[in-house]
């Protein structure tokens, strides 16, 4: 365990946030690869896998989730990502979770106060997300549900939510996006350069 983790006495959870189609899971895989030498047991939780069947069914039928659909799911995201962090030597995990509204992020924080959550928002324009969703296969979130995600999206005010960062995606290569996210993780979460 690093000295930083010992003194904080908390688990650390990196939350890759943003609308569908922003590459949260793909970036998570890149983070696992990037940090495998210093965090060999780093765990990734796919937040979509934690949705109850009723939520998946609703989204599969093209019906957007409402707040009531999300509360238990968000609590489960907080609990499972904290368990994943607790199971690693360095007490660190990564979770992909849209975390679209401030009240969702607040619920995650308050559900597991023993964890320090850092939300990294992958933000792309509607045009970019639509392009990505149209080429995506095998996922219940379809392009026609994008509007509801953008309607719900409350990008964090990083002066108010100091545990949040926004990484813009438009007009960047995947390599540049990956590099930007890695830099945020190093400087804001792991405190390494």
UniProtKB/Swiss-Prot annotation:
* Protein transport keyword on record: no
A Pfam family cross-referenced in the UniProt record is APS_kinase
Catalytic activity as recorded in UniProt: D-gluconate + ATP = 6-phospho-D-gluconate + ADP + H(+)
Q: Please indicate if the UniProt record lists Transport as a keyword.
A: no
Cite the binding residues for ATP.
Answer: 18-25
The UniProt keyword set, sorted, is: ATP-binding, Cytoplasm, Gluconate utilization, Kinase, Nucleotide-binding, Transferase
Stored SUPFAM superfamilies: P-loop containing nucleoside triphosphate hydrolases (SSF52540)
Query: Where does the record locate the signal sequence feature?
Result: none
Gene Ontology MF: a single term: ATP binding
By its UniProt entry, which InterPro entries does this protein fall under?
P-loop_NTPase, Therm_gnt_kin
Which protein, by its recorded name, is this? Probable gluconokinase
Q: Which organism is it from?
A: Saccharomyces cerevisiae (strain ATCC 204508 / S288c) (Baker's yeast)
